[in-house]
């Protein structure tokens, strides 16, 4: 998410299409490929090295606010914002639907 945000900021500053390409690729991999593991419903926070969801990561450690079990609801809002920013400069059909 933060890498996508950085790429979008770099594109805004430079208008270099490479940054927009990277932001698009990152967004596609997270909000389409990775969410396919949850039937397209959610972006999970923690993954294993093989990119499969780690459903149990920190499940029994509720005190760790920086690496919580499950997902952070605010990250859904952040992804929606980033997808809408991306759609402004690269109107791909999946962006609005996924936002």
Where are these predicted regions, by residue range?
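Glycan-recognition and catalytic cores of secretory/periplasmic carbohydrate-active enzymes
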Residues: 1-99
């Amino acid at each position: 998410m933060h890498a996508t945000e950085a790429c979008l900021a770099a594109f805004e500053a430079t208008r270099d299409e490479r940054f927009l390409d990277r932001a698009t690729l990152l967004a596609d991999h997270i909000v389409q490929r990775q969410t396919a593991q949850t039937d397209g419903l959610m972006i999970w926070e923690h993954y294993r090295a093989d990119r499969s969801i780690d459903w149990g990561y920190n499940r029994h450690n509720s005190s760790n606010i920086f690496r919580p079990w499950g997902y952070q609801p605010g990250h859904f809002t952040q992804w929606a914002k980033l997808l809408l920013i991306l759609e402004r400069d690269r109107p791909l059909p999946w962006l609005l639907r996924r936002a």
